[in-house]
């Protein structure tokens, strides 16, 4: 099959990301990339767990963490993972318009999550004086959660760029693997957040 070949809903491959050698290489390269990302976050989690009780003069996390705010942010990000699944479903069914729609919703939900995270950081800073330099816990917290937030921002820019650049190209064996890999990346940062929610916030709320 040709990369730029024109398809219909009936002739589009069920797994377009794996049809061409380029697509397979992107797929393999991405999993290797995720391996490195996993090591990065594992080291940040280990550091946080080692320093979680080193809060110096900062208020305890049981007083600072807002369970309602974090829960809403979590629901936004998890829902965005679901909308990303819908987008890939429509991609595999050669429905470019619906795929773009669900990716747009994914971006809005991700942006909402990022906005709440920025608000959360400002709240901790202004209300409690809890900053990245106020204690070892502060350094570990902002590095871990902030690194994840940076990954979310990168994911939003990545998906947005794909949507804009390929708006006229539509779906083919060149563009489909790019959308698929971006979707996998989005799922990865969602999974990382589940661990952050559990290790940082739930454990922090119980002391």
From Swiss-Prot:
Its EC number is 7.1.1.9. It is found in: Cell membrane. Belongs to the cytochrome c oxidase subunit 3 family. Pfam families: COX3 (PF00510). The gene is ctaE. It catalyses: 4 Fe(II)-[cytochrome c] + O2 + 8 H(+)(in) = 4 Fe(III)-[cytochrome c] + 2 H2O + 4 H(+)(out). GO terms for cellular component: plasma membrane. CDD domains: Ubiquinol_oxidase_III. The chain crosses the membrane at residues 30-50, 67-87, 101-121, 144-164, 186-206. Its main location: membrane. It comes from Bacillus subtilis (strain 168). Keywords: Cell membrane, Membrane, Translocase, Transmembrane, Transmembrane helix. This is Cytochrome c oxidase subunit 3. GO terms for molecular function: cytochrome-c oxidase activity. One of its GO terms (biological process) is aerobic respiration. The keyword Transmembrane helix applies. It is a multi-pass membrane protein.
